[in-house]
């Protein structure tokens, strides 16, 4: 029930469960060797094209909006497989997303329509990578799974803590090891991670992936 285990690598626990410890050991060794080789072949000059592009395409902050939320609490609600058409949509006369409607239609709300799906095989983890770092996912597999454990990131939680003293927490209803979140969130600078083990996940409190 878990296709593409070796290409997308949802969770290392799944690899051991479905393929066995021996297969996982070989797989993990090969991935480690590949990553080490990539690091040894890397050169700082590889970044020149990236730096040049970002400098040429730099967008100045909008002065009327820059800093308007300084020192405010930041709450990010990340919805899985959600689409814009459900906002203000009614089914049988009832709003499908009443709470989101109240946020979207608020007088102090800014809404952005020039916003597109850019995820690859990493799916949800790619979306989280872009949200926190502005970086795209990998051509194959998940950045969370392949590179998230051994790297640190210029990520929003760390930047906000270093520059403005913010404390941070992330809440997710799945296992912490799924998409390697338990390791990646630390390297993003999150100070607290509350996964499924912190919730009462009986049938009354669950609906598919929702808690």
PLM region descriptions:
Residues 1-72, 86-97, 101-105, 150, ...:
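N-terminal secretory/membrane-targeting segments
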Residues 46-55, 138-211:
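Catalytic-adjacent loop/helix segments of enzymes that bind and process anionic phosphate/sulfate esters
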Residues 62, 69-70, 83-159, 202:
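His/Cys-centered metal/cofactor-coordination and adjacent catalytic loops
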Residues 72-73, 169:
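Residue-level detector of short, conserved catalytic/binding motifs and their immediate flanks
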Residues 73, 77, 81:
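Catalytic glutamate of the conserved HExxH
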Residues 77, 130, 185:
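Short glycine- and Lys/Arg-enriched binding-loop motifs that mark or flank ligand-binding interfaces
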Residues 81-84, 175-177:
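Short, solvent-exposed loop/turn segments at secondary-structure junctions
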